């Protein structure tokens, strides 16, 4: 599966990486990059530390606007004309361990020359099951199929 990035989107992810910001791509965008079928327009980012000032610096370097959510009025958000609303900032992942624990099992992929760390499919499934929203329930079959295919490929690679 491909994830087409605009130049500002690619720049944001590169800036986050170069600045050492620790984040995971989660949700359906991460699942699609691991072979699941489905649709999503958003790229869900789960940051280790939302108070990291480097996040705002990276967003601004990519031409975007960072709303840290630190005033408690609304959740954190990445936006602006260049980045629009493609990125969603995830503040809590249902059914998962702490960020640092999940980061240890992250899947690394390269998308258009940008290294990304993805939440593994089995953890996406766990999170979707725990959240249990209608859109999550609808995604289960595609996620389970992708998980089964991935397991089969791994078994074949071992033999």
What are these regions, as identified by a protein language model?
Residues 1-159:
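Compositionally biased terminal segments of proteins
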């Amino acid at each position: 599966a491909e994830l087409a990035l605009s130049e500002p989107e690619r720049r944001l992810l590169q800036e986050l990486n170069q600045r050492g910001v620790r984040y995971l791509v989660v949700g359906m965008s991460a699942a699609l990059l691991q072979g699941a079928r489905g649709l999503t327009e958003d790229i869900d980012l789960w940051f280790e530390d939302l108070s990291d000032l480097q996040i705002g610096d990276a967003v601004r370097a990519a031409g975007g606007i960072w709303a840290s959510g630190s005033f408690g009025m609304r959740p954190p958000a990445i936006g602006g004309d260049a980045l629009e609303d493609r990125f969603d900032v995830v503040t809590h992942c249902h059914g998962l361990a702490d960020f640092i624990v999940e980061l240890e099992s992250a899947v690394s992929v390269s998308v258009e020359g940008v290294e990304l760390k993805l939440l593994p499919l089995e953890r996406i499934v766990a999170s979707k099951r725990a959240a249990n929203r209608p859109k999550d329930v609808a995604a289960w079959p595609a996620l389970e199929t992708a998980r089964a295919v991935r397991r089969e490929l791994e078994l074949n690679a071992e033999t």
